[in-house]
Amino acid sequence: MSHKVLQIVLVLLLTLFSSTHNSNGNFLMEEAAAAGLNGYCLLTNTTKHSYGQAFNNTPVPIKNSSFSFNIIFGIVPEHKQQGSHGMAFVFSPTRGLPGASPDQYLGIFNETNNGKASNNVIAIELDIRKDEEFGDIDDNHVGININGLTSVASASAGYYDDEDGNFKKLSLISTKVMRLSIVYSHTDKQLNVTLLPAEISVPPQKSLLSLNRDLSPYFLEETYLGFTASTGSIGALYYVMQFSYEEGVIYPAWDLGVIPTLPPYPKKSYDRTRRILAVCLTLAVFTALVASGIGFVFYVRHKKVKEVLEEWEIQNGPHRFSYKELFNATKGFKEKQLLGKGGFGQVYKGMLPGSDAEIAVKRTSHDSRQGMSEFLAEISTIGRLRHPNLVRLLGYCKHKENLYLVYDFMPNGSLDRCLTRSNTNENQERLTWEQRFKIIKDVATALLHLHQEWVQVIVHRDIKPANVLLDHGMNARLGDFGLAKLYDQGFDPQTSRVAGTLGYIAPELLRTGRATTSTDVYAFGLVMLEVVCGRRLIERRAAENEAVLVDWILELWESGKLFDAAEESIRQEQNRGEIELVLKLGLLCAHHTELIRPNMSAVLQILNGVSHLPNNLLDVVRAERLRGIPETSMEVLLGLDLNSFGTMTLTNSFVSHGR
């Protein structure tokens, strides 16, 4: 049987830089992962209770497909007779697995998300520790895991010899180089996993593990491939030396020639440590005396930035770009590279040298307290997240008096420009209903991740069309986390500042100054209405009864003409059901009463047709005579152009605690 081989991820020697968060070529390295001996990928170092991840930069379309993977790897334990925890080959919906834990969680899951069906993660684990809580069979096994660490199939490490059919045991912690073969037949719905010594070039006919199951429901349309590993109180070094992916059911012969020998685990040398310590102390005293004057001047000059960022950078910092890299990428921050500007600063388009990756660079000053606050808010929230519907923060830079944030470039701009463009410029294509409906679902999915799926709750506090960006495929990504706040699950946020954009601020936020996930839902409801109607919340030039978008939609609903609220270009009969659903759901989300609004999980279920709106929804809305904008701010907005407002922050005189 012949197969068309698609070498999407070549046979690699993973040559990567060593840092907390770095990328090179096809793979992104995070946490303890770095380049090791001879350029091999080293997933961990000698740090205890740590983990490393290495994921390919480009997703692979393996849903509804057959595929074959081959990995050459080796494990070097700290102690010859006792393992650490293990490593895994991972299929992930995102590039990287944020919030993962070390030890028994293998750098894949954590205590909160382990076992959740929404993970969409499949892992082939090479486990060198028996964890009773996950039902491990022993401390030297291979397992197939779906969405959690309890294996759906597992077997002790080894292989079946083709000559005599006998099972030959292998020790994962033998420091020997081994090969792992992962082959899935979409036609037969069967996953085969084979482990064998690296010196055997042809895989045995009988697999170590076979799972008869359709894997398509667990994969998204595009899946990221990667490796994870973790250590506990005992260390181990995990090497990935070669890796190949081929389309189809293929069991290739793989002759490595001379099998490399992995170096032993580093031994502690107390004498050497004492000598180094003595030299370092001497040099430190001398350097401190010589550099004290220069250091004092530098400290005074940059005190503000260092005081706020130093601790955070050490613990959680994403990739830090040099100013030279960004200067070259944006062609010296020239005017023709400028994408936009406002109170936050300027945004420039650029291209990273040595690659074809387009980026957007936001430049702002750290002189103002607000500029520094928003800079830190972005890094501490979206800098730690990876989700297909969130704008990806690639890194940051501090140079002189300026702060820089680097994002993926979104070629189709912001949603508000697309909505405005479709009304004012007949030469531009209008958004189709299919595009609008997908945009709404994409933003809802992003908010669900922020509110309910991540380890901590993130309240965005500035949901509006201008902060929804569209990539080359018109997929929506939520951005601008400058006002975002995060807090632990189960705890209420407390704040004395009202932040957001006029018109999108929930009524209770003006009264209490307390931003919650429900205030995000309120703003999202208004965004849904704008997307369907193709207009702003306030239209001064419209007829009096049409000036306020929410009031106008409600009046049309009451008169049985709700469908007429949709923009004319999408007002086709086949779209009626979905359009009216979104309009009603938007009004429900933008309800004045906080407790009536659904959470984002319920919103997505309704959008996906899993749940339905209540039959008496109009009565619920009528009861409060819903108005989309508080009266205190409505008068201001009717007299001013909404475009003239950026993100505003008001100070409240009191704080309300509790719900």
UniProtKB/Swiss-Prot annotation:
One of its GO terms (molecular function) is protein serine/threonine kinase activity. GO terms for cellular component: plasma membrane. Residues 333-595 form the Protein kinase domain. ATP binds at L339, G340, K341, G342, G343, F344, G345, Q346, V347, K362. Its EC number is 2.7.11.1. The active site is at D462. Residues 297-659 are cytoplasmic. It holds the Pfam family Pkinase. It is a single-pass type I membrane protein. It catalyses: L-seryl-[protein] + ATP = O-phospho-L-seryl-[protein] + ADP + H(+); L-threonyl-[protein] + ATP = O-phospho-L-threonyl-[protein] + ADP + H(+). Residues 26-275 are extracellular. Glycans are attached at N45, N64, N110, N192. The chain crosses the membrane at residues 276-296. Keywords: ATP-binding, Cell membrane, Glycoprotein, Kinase, Lectin, Membrane, Nucleotide-binding, Plant defense, Receptor, Serine/threonine-protein kinase, Signal, Transferase, Transmembrane, Transmembrane helix. Coiled coil: none annotated. The keyword Flavoprotein does not apply. It is found in: Cell membrane. Residues 1-25 form the signal peptide. InterPro entries: ConA-like_dom_sf, Kinase-like_dom_sf, L-type_Lectin-RKs, Legume_lectin_dom, Prot_kinase_dom, Protein_kinase_ATP_BS, Ser/Thr_kinase_AS. Disruption phenotype: Increased susceptibility to the oomycetes Phytophthora brassicae and Phytophthora capsici and to the bacteria Pseudomonas syringae, characterized by stronger necrotic symptoms. The keyword Membrane applies. One of its GO terms (biological process) is defense response to bacterium. Residues 22-244 are annotated as: Legume-lectin like. Involved in resistance response to the pathogenic oomycetes Phytophthora infestans and Phytophthora capsici and to the pathogenic bacteria Pseudomonas syringae. In the C-terminal section; belongs to the protein kinase superfamily. Ser/Thr protein kinase family. This is L-type lectin-domain containing receptor kinase V.7. It comes from Arabidopsis thaliana (Mouse-ear cress). The gene is LECRK57.
